[in-house]
Amino acid sequence: VFAYRERMITRCHIKGDAPSVAVYSDCERYRYLLTREWAPAQGRALFIMLNPSTATEVQNDPTVERCERRARALGFGGFRVCNIFAYRATDPRVMRAAADPVGPDNDGAIMDSVPWADRVICAWGTHGAHLDRGARVAAMLRATGVDLFHLGLSKAGHPKHPLYIGYAVQPVAWV
């Protein structure tokens, strides 16, 4: 387990049938993890996306709602969201303008989440080109030997963001 550099705030809530946990930096500018589990024995999906928006342990934003519905449709009993940038912003331009959009403990949070998951779905979209972060995270993940999946690739080869991808699209191995 990674030794985090900052103090973390962990908040829990029961959202419907799913205990929910969110981990934030002590300043709350960063959200490192968001986890919902309703039947962990059924397996867990890890979505690695761009950056956190407004979702909390209590409420989904549109993207996290899509991830939850997709995880349920795929037969998983839980999911977690990590992001290649942990800075909380609704607009990628605001995230890109932040002094440290990655967050001091983000790599540790991502790497701690990989063994937690039964399937890792990369989905950060074309904004992953910022600071070459998408490629760096992909290399970090590939070094673990875990199989990576995506929901489609952009023309530039970035794993597509899930917000506008239909539920009929199945995760595909990212080789």
Where are these regions (language model features)?
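Glycine/proline-rich loop-helix segments at beta-alpha junctions forming the active-site rim
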Residues: M95-V175
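Short connector loops at secondary-structure junctions
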Residues: G77-R93
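Residues at alpha-helix caps and immediate loop-helix transition turns in enzyme cores, especially N-
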Residues: Q59-T63, D132-G134
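Short catalytic helix/loop segments, enriched in acidic residues and glycine
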Residues: V64-R72
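Active-site and ligand/interface coordination hotspots across diverse enzymes
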Residues: F2-D61
